[in-house]
A protein has these predicted regions:
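Juxtamembrane "helix exit" motif at the C-terminal ends of alpha-helical transmembrane segments
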Residues: 2-6, 88-115, 202-210, 216-221
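Hydrophobic alpha-helical transmembrane segments
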Residues: 9-20, 113-129, 206-211
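Hydrophobic alpha-helical membrane-embedded segments
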Residues: 15-43, 81-96, 126-149
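Membrane-spanning helices that line or support transport/gating and their immediate boundary helices
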Residues: 31, 35-40, 149, 153, ...
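Membrane-interface amphipathic/juxtamembrane segments adjacent to transmembrane helices
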Residues: 33-73
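Solvent-exposed, non-transmembrane helices and loops of integral membrane proteins
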Residues: 56-67, 152-183
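Transmembrane alpha-helical segments and their cytosolic interface motifs
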Residues: 69-95, 183-210
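Juxtamembrane membrane-interface segments at transmembrane alpha-helix termini
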Residues: 162, 221-233
Length: 237
C-alpha cells in the first residue's frame, strides 16, 4: 500500500487514469445512446423527440399553421441563445480564473489524501474546461442557425404545377431532417454542460472527477431512457 501511494504521488498516473475513465464513460455513453436510438427510436427520449418533430413538421406544412411554427421555433431559438450566452460567460469566468491559478492551487485542492497536489496540471485543467465550454457554445450557435433555416423552409410553399403528394412528403422530410439536426446540436450543447460538472470537481482531486463522472452518467441514463410503459405506448401508436 505504501509503495502504491508513493508511485501515485510521484507521477500523474491517478489524474491521467481518472481523466481517461471520464472520457471513456462519456463518449461510450453517447455512442451507446446513439446505437440504441438507431435500433429502437422509442428507447430514448431523444428518439421520441425526433419522431415528434417530424410529425409536427408534417402537420404544420399540411395545415398551414404558420403562426404556430414561428412561435415554436422562436422559443427554441431563445433557449439556444440563452445557453450559448451562458457558455460564453462561463468561458470568460474560466479565463479570469486562469490568472488566479496560484490561489486555486491552495483553496481548491483541500483533500491531499485523494491525490497529490500537481500544481503543473492546473493550467491543463482550465484549458480542458475552456475547450468544453467553447464546444458547447458552437453547438448551441449551430442549432440557432439551423432553427433559423427551418423557419424559412417550413413556411415555403411550392406553387408550381407539380402538387403531388410525394412532392409534399419529400419537402416535409427535408424540413424535418433539418429540424432534427438543430435538435441534435442543441442536445450536444447540453451534453457539454453536463460533462463540465466532473471537470469542475477535478479541481478538488482526481477521485472527485471519477465519482462525479459516474454520478452524472447514471443520472443522464435515467433522464434519457424511456420508461417501459411509455415505450410500449409509442410502439403501439
Amino acid at each position: 500500500m505504501i509503495f502504491l501511494n508513493s508511485v501515485i504521488s510521484s507521477s500523474y498516473l491517478l489524474d491521467g487514469l481518472c481523466f481517461l475513465l471520464y472520457c471513456t464513460m462519456f463518449f461510450g455513453y453517447m455512442r451507446f445512446i446513439e446505437w440504441k436510438s438507431r435500433g429502437n427510436p422509442v428507447y430514448t427520449v431523444q428518439g421520441i423527440s425526433s419522431l415528434a418533430r417530424a410529425t409536427w413538421v408534417k402537420t404544420v406544412m399540411e395545415e398551414g399553421k404558420d403562426i404556430l411554427a414561428v412561435q415554436t421555433l422562436r422559443n427554441s431559438t431563445m433557449a439556444a441563445t440563452f445557453l450559448a450566452s451562458t457558455a460564453i460567460l462561463l468561458s470568460v469566468g474560466v479565463l479570469t480564473l486562469s490568472g488566479q491559478s496560484d490561489k486555486l492551487k491552495i483553496t481548491w485542492q483541500l483533500l491531499e489524501y485523494f491525490g497529490d497536489r500537481h500544481e503543473e496540471l492546473m493550467p491543463a485543467k482550465l484549458i480542458i474546461l475552456l475547450v468544453n465550454l467553447f464546444a458547447a457554445f458552437f453547438f448551441f450557435a449551430s442549432s440557432i442557425r439551423l432553427y433559423g433555416d427551418v423557419g424559412y423552409m417550413i413556411n415555403a410553399r411550392y406553387t408550381g404545377q407539380d402538387q403531388s403528394e410525394s412532392r409534399k412528403v419529400v419537402e416535409a422530410e427535408v424540413v424535418a431532417d433539418q429540424l432534427n439536426r438543430a435538435g441534435d446540436h442543441y442536445r450536444m450543447g447540453m451534453r457539454g454542460f453536463y460533462s463540465m460538472v466532473p471537470l469542475v470537481f477535478w479541481f478538488f482531486g482526481p477521485i472527485f472527477l471519477l465519482g462525479a463522472s459516474v454520478l452524472v452518467v447514471t443520472i443522464l441514463f435515467h433522464l434519457d431512457r424511456t420508461h417501459a410503459m411509455e415505450e410500449d405506448f409509442y410502439k403501439e401508436t
